[in-house]
Amino acid sequence: MPLIRDIHQRFWRLPQLPWLELRTTSESRQAYKRHSPPQLSLGAIIAGETRCISNGQEYLLRPGELILIPPQSPHSCNPLHERPRSYHMLYLDADWCLTQLPHLPADSRLHTTQPQLQNPQLFQLYQQIVTSITQQQTAGLPALIIHLLRALPLQSADAEPPCAISRQLVARLVSNLQKPPTLDTLAQEFALRKETLIRTFKQDTGLTPVSFTNMARIEYARHRLRAGDDIADVAYQTGFADQSHFHKTFVSYTAATPRQYAQNRSISDNK
């Protein structure tokens, strides 16, 4: 399998449109750990096949198909039989999306019952958006994205909000990403067994406390890398023992190296 540093991929961010990010990846066999980005994610399969698991359901994605992942929805999208696949992934800020969906309450949690989309018209519109972003043609781009967004099968989630324990646990976990509390410490603080904490939290979030913490650290790292912080500083800010540990964890959740993400371009000499 090619090294992650040799995979041709690029991240596109436009300063005048801070609510969007585009990723383009070619011929990658790199797998992802289960993750739950805070943005609305819309992927397009260009070549190869991808196996996506979301909300306990498995979807086989082929070229010409889209995959719609609501914000904070745990999922994994990985190559089938370790064969290479090429794809785009468009990330849209969740709050911005809600402002463009007036039929939904402003405090909605976005949800879909149809994540796999086999719609040639939507796929063509998606490709038009990708072309506009990669050529930095911003005039008319917001209107195209809003048109696409409003055509997606999105609803407001009817699910019950997380229980008090999970809400408190989230607040505790993100309060100090540089030195997150151990499960033993949390069990003592909440006067609960570790197994009970893990089970309750996973029922509400789809992730274990450890996975949630790693996701929060990587999301904060992405934010600091976009801001231009040095990779070694970001590794320290997010509480990793060393840069190697940070690199390995970042790759496992994003299928990209910190340097690829920070430099916003595809390079073949990432370390």
Task: Annotate each language-model stretch with its function.
Residues 9-107:
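N-terminal regulatory/effector-sensing and dimerization cores
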Residues 64, 197, 201, 245-246, ...:
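Short hydrophobic/aromatic patch on the recognition helix
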Residues 101-160, 171:
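Amphipathic alpha-helical segments enriched in hydrophobic/aromatic residues interleaved with Lys/Arg
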Residues 121-132, 165-176, 220, 224-227:
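Solvent-exposed, amphipathic alpha-helical segments
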Residues 156-165, 207-213:
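Short, Lys/Arg-enriched anionic-surface-contact patches
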Residues 171, 184, 202-247, 263-271:
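Terminal helix-turn-helix DNA-binding modules in bacterial transcription factors
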Residues 176-180, 208-209, 229, 257-258:
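Short helix/strand-capping hinge loops at secondary-structure junctions
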Residues 189, 193-194, 241-242:
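Short coil turns linking two alpha-helices in DNA-binding domains
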